[in-house]
Amino acid sequence: MSSTPHDPFYSSPFGPFYRRHTPYMVQPEYRIYEMNKRLQSRTEDSDNLWWDAFATEFFEDDATLTLSFCLEDGPKRYTIGRTLIPRYFSTVFEGGVTDLYYILKHSKESYHNSSITVDCDQCAMVTQHGKPMFTKVCTEGRLILEFTFDDLMRIKTWHFTIRQYRELVPRSILAMHAQDPQVLDQLSKNITRMGLTNFTLNYLRLCVILEPMQELMSRHKTYNLSPRDCLKTCLFQKWQRMVAPPAEPTRQPTTKRRKRKNSTSSTSNSSAGNTTNSAGSKKKTPAASLSLATQVPDVMVVGEPTLMGGEFGDEDERLITRLENTQYDAANGMDDEEDFNNSPALGNNSPWNSKPPATQETKSENAPPQASQ
């Protein structure tokens, strides 16, 4: 009988119809489990390309890795960028480590808009050393991880604070060399410093110099410039950013408000009907003494305002209209109410025409019709 799985959703990757499963959101701790399995699948022939692929799978392009611990000469804190992360993991194995994995206990997760933060106060980094003697090192501390909130769930920030470490030697090795004081003296010495090998510590010290030079190395690789030219270019661009004036806030362009044609036509009609009524009025306004090209009898219409290569805004246009024309307001359409009040269909005793005059000018306009009656 064939050993084909009975899962209806199973599709062999070697078959003609390979189906990739829909990506799903996994738990952050499971990503650490996948990273441990990937580190265990490492071989002695793993080159830089393998480590670059490892870092690309589990770390973001702008990821940072930070290690904090305390040595004999004081506390240390090293932060490296995404470019130097693959080399960090490779130096761990170059220092005699044969196996590396992380154990997270009682971790706390917090979800944000674009990231997931994992805070594990009881994290253990376990390394197996094959030389000079078989030793198991347990490095305990606090691990804070920030994952991206997407299907890839790659690490954006890695911060491991080392508190203590222990080096464990099997009893069988002690029993074998119980009669050899030189071997026992060698086994009593630590092979790591705060759980890190000398290879890793030297690399972290080197990263203090390499991390600021990432821009120079990237420019050298991109433009094929000499190191001196790369340094000059970077310094010049940094100087430009320092002396450049702050960017001015963008101003919104002024919009030009045009007159409504229907209001203008109704105003001209109403002014033509009221010519005889206002002929006997002795009122004289400043607007009547001005002359404009677009002028109708007894009504002053303001044209489009311009000013030496620029245009007035809405606020200026309203101000000019208010100064030059006291009988006509194009913005609010006050002439419609004047047409309604002066309609011949309304008598003097009509309840719709009982609005008292507001100013002395209105009384003077209504005086001639009352005299004619």
UniProtKB/Swiss-Prot annotation:
GO molecular function list: enzyme binding; LIM domain binding
Domain of life: Eukaryota
GO process annotations (BP): epithelial structure maintenance; hair follicle development; positive regulation of cellular component biogenesis; positive regulation of transcription by RNA polymerase II; regulation of cell migration; regulation of kinase activity; somatic stem cell population maintenance
Domain LIM interaction domain (LID): 298-337
Keyword Ubl conjugation among record annotations: yes
Subcellular location: Nucleus
Expression across tissues: Expressed in multiple tissues including heart, brain, liver, kidney, testis, lung and muscle, with expression highest in the brain, trigeminal ganglia, and lung.
Regions of compositional bias (Polar residues) in chain numbering: 341-373
Pfam families, per database record: LID, LIM_bind
Low complexity: compositionally biased ranges: 263-280
PTM remark: Ubiquitinated by RLIM/RNF12, leading to its degradation by the proteasome.
Major localization listed first in the record, in broad terms: nucleus
Gene Ontology, cellular component aspect: cell leading edge; nucleolus; nucleoplasm; nucleus; plasma membrane; transcription regulator complex
InterPro entries assigned to the protein according to its UniProt record, in alphabetical order: LID (IPR041363), LIM-bd/SEUSS (IPR029005)
Subunit structure: Interacts with LHX9. Interacts with SLK; leading to negatively regulate SLK kinase activity. Interacts with LMO4.
Protein purpose: Transcription cofactor. Binds to the LIM domain of a wide variety of LIM domain-containing transcription factors.
Name listed for the protein in its UniProt record: LIM domain-binding protein 2
Organism: Mus musculus (Mouse)
